[in-house]
Amino acid sequence: PGFPGLWMTAAEVAFMKAEAYANNWATGNAKSEYINGIKLSTEFYFDLNSTGTYRDPLTPPSAAEVEAYAETQWDASNPQKSILTQRWIHHGAIQEYEAWNVVRRTGYPEIYFKRDPQSVATPLPLDRIQYPADEKDYNSANLNAHLGGKEDSWYAPLNWMKSNWYTTVE
Protein backbone atom coordinates (compact mmCIF):
# COMPACT_ATOMS: atom_id res chain seq x y z
CA PRO A 1 0.00 0.00 0.00
CA GLY A 2 2.26 2.95 -0.72
CA PHE A 3 2.64 4.86 -3.88
CA PRO A 4 3.28 2.49 -6.80
CA GLY A 5 6.80 2.67 -8.16
CA LEU A 6 7.16 3.49 -11.81
CA TRP A 7 9.96 3.72 -14.27
CA MET A 8 8.19 5.33 -17.19
CA THR A 9 4.54 5.88 -17.99
CA ALA A 10 2.73 5.30 -21.27
CA ALA A 11 1.97 9.03 -21.38
CA GLU A 12 5.66 9.85 -21.11
CA VAL A 13 6.39 7.55 -24.06
CA ALA A 14 3.67 9.26 -26.11
CA PHE A 15 5.12 12.70 -25.32
CA MET A 16 8.62 11.47 -26.21
CA LYS A 17 7.32 10.17 -29.53
CA ALA A 18 5.53 13.47 -30.17
CA GLU A 19 8.77 15.36 -29.51
CA ALA A 20 10.69 13.04 -31.84
CA TYR A 21 8.13 13.53 -34.60
CA ALA A 22 8.03 17.31 -34.15
CA ASN A 23 11.84 17.44 -34.41
CA ASN A 24 11.88 15.13 -37.46
CA TRP A 25 13.96 12.59 -35.55
CA ALA A 26 11.41 9.96 -36.56
CA THR A 27 8.43 9.70 -38.88
CA GLY A 28 5.00 10.09 -37.35
CA ASN A 29 2.30 12.54 -36.38
CA ALA A 30 3.39 14.77 -33.48
CA LYS A 31 -0.08 16.14 -32.80
CA SER A 32 -1.66 12.67 -32.63
CA GLU A 33 0.95 11.47 -30.14
CA TYR A 34 0.59 14.69 -28.15
CA ILE A 35 -3.18 14.14 -27.86
CA ASN A 36 -2.57 10.49 -27.02
CA GLY A 37 -0.12 11.58 -24.31
CA ILE A 38 -2.71 13.84 -22.70
CA LYS A 39 -5.30 11.04 -22.84
CA LEU A 40 -2.89 8.57 -21.24
CA SER A 41 -1.79 11.10 -18.61
CA THR A 42 -5.39 11.84 -17.67
CA GLU A 43 -6.16 8.13 -17.47
CA PHE A 44 -3.05 7.52 -15.34
CA TYR A 45 -3.88 10.20 -12.79
CA PHE A 46 -7.55 9.26 -12.51
CA ASP A 47 -6.61 5.58 -12.12
CA LEU A 48 -4.13 6.58 -9.42
CA ASN A 49 -6.80 8.67 -7.72
CA SER A 50 -9.14 5.67 -7.64
CA THR A 51 -6.67 3.72 -5.46
CA GLY A 52 -7.08 6.16 -2.57
CA THR A 53 -9.15 5.07 0.41
CA TYR A 54 -9.57 8.44 2.07
CA ARG A 55 -12.45 9.55 -0.15
CA ASP A 56 -14.48 8.55 -3.17
CA PRO A 57 -12.69 8.58 -6.53
CA LEU A 58 -13.22 11.52 -8.83
CA THR A 59 -15.18 11.02 -12.04
CA PRO A 60 -12.81 11.19 -15.00
CA PRO A 61 -13.58 13.37 -17.99
CA SER A 62 -14.79 11.69 -21.16
CA ALA A 63 -12.38 10.93 -23.99
CA ALA A 64 -14.08 13.67 -26.02
CA GLU A 65 -13.53 16.21 -23.22
CA VAL A 66 -9.86 15.28 -22.93
CA GLU A 67 -9.38 15.51 -26.69
CA ALA A 68 -11.14 18.89 -26.80
CA TYR A 69 -8.82 20.16 -24.06
CA ALA A 70 -5.76 18.83 -25.91
CA GLU A 71 -6.85 20.58 -29.10
CA THR A 72 -7.06 23.93 -27.26
CA GLN A 73 -3.51 23.49 -25.93
CA TRP A 74 -1.90 22.55 -29.26
CA ASP A 75 0.17 25.31 -30.87
CA ALA A 76 0.90 24.29 -34.46
CA SER A 77 3.39 27.15 -34.78
CA ASN A 78 5.39 25.83 -31.79
CA PRO A 79 4.59 22.16 -31.22
CA GLN A 80 7.59 21.72 -28.90
CA LYS A 81 6.12 24.22 -26.46
CA SER A 82 2.82 22.32 -26.38
CA ILE A 83 4.39 18.87 -26.14
CA LEU A 84 7.02 19.66 -23.54
CA THR A 85 4.75 21.76 -21.35
CA GLN A 86 2.26 18.89 -21.16
CA ARG A 87 5.07 16.41 -20.50
CA TRP A 88 6.29 18.64 -17.65
CA ILE A 89 2.74 18.79 -16.25
CA HIS A 90 2.46 15.01 -16.53
CA HIS A 91 5.63 14.47 -14.48
CA GLY A 92 4.30 16.82 -11.82
CA ALA A 93 5.13 15.93 -8.25
CA ILE A 94 5.41 12.20 -8.96
CA GLN A 95 8.52 12.43 -11.15
CA GLU A 96 9.82 15.83 -10.10
CA TYR A 97 13.41 15.18 -11.19
CA GLU A 98 12.23 14.19 -14.65
CA ALA A 99 10.13 17.37 -14.80
CA TRP A 100 13.23 19.36 -13.82
CA ASN A 101 15.24 17.60 -16.53
CA VAL A 102 12.62 18.37 -19.19
CA VAL A 103 12.65 22.10 -18.46
CA ARG A 104 16.46 22.27 -18.21
CA ARG A 105 16.93 20.34 -21.46
CA THR A 106 14.32 22.18 -23.51
CA GLY A 107 13.41 25.49 -21.87
CA TYR A 108 9.74 24.44 -21.76
CA PRO A 109 7.57 25.33 -20.07
CA GLU A 110 8.82 28.88 -19.99
CA ILE A 111 9.66 29.59 -16.36
CA TYR A 112 10.36 32.97 -14.78
CA PHE A 113 12.29 33.48 -11.54
CA LYS A 114 13.12 36.44 -9.41
CA ARG A 115 16.52 36.44 -7.73
CA ASP A 116 16.16 35.70 -4.00
CA PRO A 117 18.20 38.35 -2.17
CA GLN A 118 17.88 36.44 1.11
CA SER A 119 19.62 33.36 -0.26
CA VAL A 120 23.35 33.85 -0.58
CA ALA A 121 24.26 30.33 -1.71
CA THR A 122 21.43 29.69 -4.15
CA PRO A 123 19.66 32.90 -5.19
CA LEU A 124 18.50 31.37 -8.50
CA PRO A 125 17.25 27.92 -9.55
CA LEU A 126 19.92 25.25 -9.42
CA ASP A 127 21.37 23.90 -12.65
CA ARG A 128 22.29 20.61 -11.06
CA ILE A 129 22.85 18.73 -7.81
CA GLN A 130 26.33 18.70 -6.31
CA TYR A 131 28.17 15.45 -5.72
CA PRO A 132 27.73 14.05 -2.19
CA ALA A 133 30.46 14.44 0.43
CA ASP A 134 31.14 10.67 0.36
CA GLU A 135 32.10 10.94 -3.30
CA LYS A 136 34.59 13.68 -2.44
CA ASP A 137 35.94 11.73 0.55
CA TYR A 138 36.23 8.25 -0.96
CA ASN A 139 36.55 8.79 -4.71
CA SER A 140 38.23 12.18 -5.03
CA ALA A 141 40.67 11.15 -7.78
CA ASN A 142 37.91 10.01 -10.13
CA LEU A 143 35.63 12.89 -9.16
CA ASN A 144 38.35 15.46 -9.85
CA ALA A 145 39.16 13.79 -13.18
CA HIS A 146 35.47 13.89 -14.08
CA LEU A 147 35.11 17.54 -13.12
CA GLY A 148 38.18 18.37 -15.23
CA GLY A 149 39.40 21.05 -12.87
CA LYS A 150 36.01 22.73 -12.68
CA GLU A 151 34.27 23.50 -9.42
CA ASP A 152 31.51 21.18 -8.19
CA SER A 153 28.93 23.95 -8.25
CA TRP A 154 25.14 24.09 -8.13
CA TYR A 155 25.47 26.38 -11.16
CA ALA A 156 27.87 24.36 -13.32
CA PRO A 157 25.69 23.57 -16.36
CA LEU A 158 25.40 20.03 -17.62
CA ASN A 159 26.42 19.38 -21.22
CA TRP A 160 22.86 18.56 -22.30
CA MET A 161 21.00 21.48 -20.79
CA LYS A 162 20.07 24.81 -22.29
CA SER A 163 22.04 27.70 -20.87
CA ASN A 164 18.89 29.82 -20.69
CA TRP A 165 16.36 27.31 -19.38
CA TYR A 166 14.64 29.97 -17.29
CA THR A 167 14.22 33.74 -17.44
CA THR A 168 15.22 36.02 -14.58
CA VAL A 169 12.81 38.85 -13.86
CA GLU A 170 13.35 41.88 -11.67
What residue spans do the PLM features occupy?
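Catalytic cores of enzymes that engage adenine nucleotides and/or redox cofactors via long glycine-rich
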Residues: 1
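Extended, hydrophobic/aromatic-rich amphipathic alpha-helical segments that build helical scaffolds
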Residues: 4-25, 33-41, 82-88
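Residue-level recognition of short, well-ordered coil/turn positions
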Residues: 25-26, 108
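C-terminal functional modules
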Residues: 42-170
